[in-house]
Amino acid sequence: MNVGVAHSEVNPNTRVMNSRGIWLTYALGVGMLHIVLLSIPFFSVPVVWTLTNVIHNFGMYVFMHAVKGTPFETPDQGKARLLTHWEQLDYGVQFTSSRKFFTISPIILYFLASFYTKYDTAHFVINTASLLSVLIPKLPQLHGVRIFGINKY
């Protein structure tokens, strides 16, 4: 360990999801979202699970697949300017532990939401559409692909 030495990452955005405690913080955040939604008196348990799933997946889509660039000035001459956070994650290397975690977490949440909604058709369709909206952009075949030119610039 180099004490007193600045990080040497050209783009710190590439390694932030490997930081100590980020997975626990992520899981606690999803749990807190669920508890807050459960505390709203007129929501039933199936509605809360569906809302937790949809809000989580919407947030994941926006922060991982829609927002591009880095939140700070980097010395990489703007190479990351046109990449989403998912494409920058772990320098674009596929099947790393962080990518697996952020791929499996919406699937686990989907299974929980489906179970607690008792596989009701309306909830099932909403949860499935929400899951597919975050899983399809994570596929390795879609790395750097902009469908119909959406989010190209």
Curated annotation (Swiss-Prot):
Domain of life of the organism encoding this protein: Eukaryota
Family statement drawn from the similarity comment of this UniProt entry: Belongs to the ORM family.
UniProt note: domains: Ceramides bind to ORMDL3 N-terminus and stabilize it in a conformation that physically restricts the accessibility of the substrates to their binding sites in the serine palmitoyltransferase (SPT) complex, hence inhibiting SPT catalytic activity. In the absence of ceramides, the N-terminus is flexible and permits substrate binding, thus liberating SPT from inhibition.
Membrane topology of the entry: Multi-pass membrane protein
GO cellular component labels: endoplasmic reticulum membrane; serine palmitoyltransferase complex
The name this protein goes by in its record: ORM1-like protein 1
Keywords: Endoplasmic reticulum, Membrane, Transmembrane, Transmembrane helix
Record note on quaternary structure: Ceramide-sensitive subunit of the serine palmitoyltransferase (SPT) complex, which is also composed of SPTLC1, SPTLC2/3 and SPTSSA/B.
Function: Plays an essential role in the homeostatic regulation of sphingolipid de novo biosynthesis by modulating the activity of the serine palmitoyltransferase (SPT) in response to ceramide levels. When complexed to SPT, the binding of ceramides to its N-terminus stabilizes a conformation that block SPT substrate entry, hence preventing SPT catalytic activity. Through this mechanism, maintains ceramide levels at sufficient concentrations for the production of complex sphingolipids, but which prevents the accumulation of ceramides to levels that trigger apoptosis.
UniProt-listed GO biological process terms: ceramide metabolic process; intracellular sphingolipid homeostasis; regulation of ceramide biosynthetic process; sphingolipid biosynthetic process
Organism: Danio rerio (Zebrafish)
Cytoplasmic side: 1-27, 65-105, 141-153
Cross-referenced Pfam families: ORMDL (PF04061)
Localization (cell): Endoplasmic reticulum membrane
Transmembrane intervals: 28-46, 47-64, 106-123, 124-140
